[in-house]
Amino acid sequence: MKVTLKHHEELGPLVRATRKCQGMRQDDTAEGIGVSENFLAKVERGGGTVQWQKLFQVLTELGLRVEIDVPDAAVALLQEQDRMRGAKR
């Protein structure tokens, strides 16, 4: 099921629910992923100061993917910027 997140605080409960559905304890999960239990707890609470690299490490290890619905106009702009960079080379 795809879930659209509107705020960073909404990600934490999804991480926690996924971990619990997999029957994993917080301390064991953190150790297995290579992050501190304190960090994983911050992720699960939706802490705003979470380090992105570690956050994606946690998400990947739990089998969660982040999908972003990008407006067509933004995709077109990025493609145009890529073409412009390619033309300058």
Where are these regions (language model features)?
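A short, Lys/Arg-rich alpha-helix, primarily the initiator
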Residues: 1-20
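Residue-level signal for the short linker/turn that defines the boundary of a DNA-recognition helix
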Residues: 13, 23-24, 50
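Conserved amphipathic alpha-helical interaction elements at protein-protein interfaces in regulatory
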Residues: 17, 21, 61-64
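DNA major-groove recognition helix of helix-turn-helix/homeodomain DNA-binding modules
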Residues: 53-69
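Short, charged recognition helix plus adjacent turn
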Residues: 67-89
